[in-house]
Amino acid sequence: MIGLVGKKVGMTRIFTEDGVSIPVTVIEIEANRVTQVKDLANDGYRAVQVTAGAKKANRVTKPEAGHFAKAGVEAGRTLREFRLSEGEEFTVGQSISVEIFADIKKVDVTGTSKGKGFAGTVKRWNFRTQDATHGNSLSHRAPGSIGQNQTPGKVFKGKKMAGQLGNERVTVQSLDVVRVDAERNLLLVKGAVPGATGSDLIVKPAVKA
C-alpha cells in the first residue's frame, strides 16, 4: 500500500473513555493528487507520484508547471513517489485522501529532524562526561581517545565525534493510529514524529506491523 504526504500540525493529547491521557501528534494530510503513474513497460517498475498542498505561481518553475499541467492538477509544494504493490491501480489526476488509513493500525512516519547545529559528543552521542574534579580541569566534556597507535594508524570511519546534529531524514516506526478525521483531513498518531511544526512528513503503513 502507498503512503501519503502530510504536514506536522503539532502535538496535543486526547482522552479515552476510561480517562487515560494519550499524547498524540496531529498530522494534516490534504488530498494527495496523482501527477504521474509509472509502469513496468516504460519505467521498469510500478510507482505513483503525488503532490500535496499548494505553491505560489511565481515559485513554480517552468518544468514543474508543465509537469503539473500535463497531469491536470494544481501545483503542489512537493513531489513524492511511492512504489505500487500488486493490484494497486491509480490514474493521473486522481485525489487520494487520509481515508486510506481508516483500517490501518500502525504507521511509519518519515520527516526531517530539527537541526541543532554543531554539537559535541555528550549532546550528539550521549557520551559520559569525565570527572568534574579529581585533578581534571579542562577535559570535562572532551571525547577522549579517538583511536589506537601506529596500528591501525588511522581513525576508523564512522567514529562518533562532534559534528552536525539533526537536520537529517529520520523515520519513526510502528506508531499507533489513534484517530482518522476524514472531515478535517487529520491523522492522529500516538507519540512524537520528527521535524518542526509545519514541516512535511511521509506517512506509510508500518513495515513491522
UniProtKB/Swiss-Prot annotation:
Answer whether the UniProt record assigns the keyword RNA-binding to this protein: yes
Residue numbers of N5-methylglutamine PTMs? 150
- Signal peptide (UniProt feature, chain positions): none
InterPro entries per the record? Ribosomal_uL3, Ribosomal_uL3_bac/org-type, Ribosomal_uL3_CS, Transl_B-barrel_sf
Q: GO annotations under biological process?
A: translation
Q: Which UniProt keywords apply?
A: Methylation, Ribonucleoprotein, Ribosomal protein, RNA-binding, rRNA-binding
**One Pfam family here:** Ribosomal_L3
Kindly provide the PTM information from the record.
Methylated by PrmB.
PROSITE patterns reported for this sequence: RIBOSOMAL_L3
Q: How does it assemble?
A: Part of the 50S ribosomal subunit. Forms a cluster with proteins L14 and L19.
Q: Which family does it belong to?
A: Belongs to the universal ribosomal protein uL3 family.
**What is the name of the protein in this document?**
Large ribosomal subunit protein uL3
Species of the source: Pectobacterium atrosepticum (strain SCRI 1043 / ATCC BAA-672)
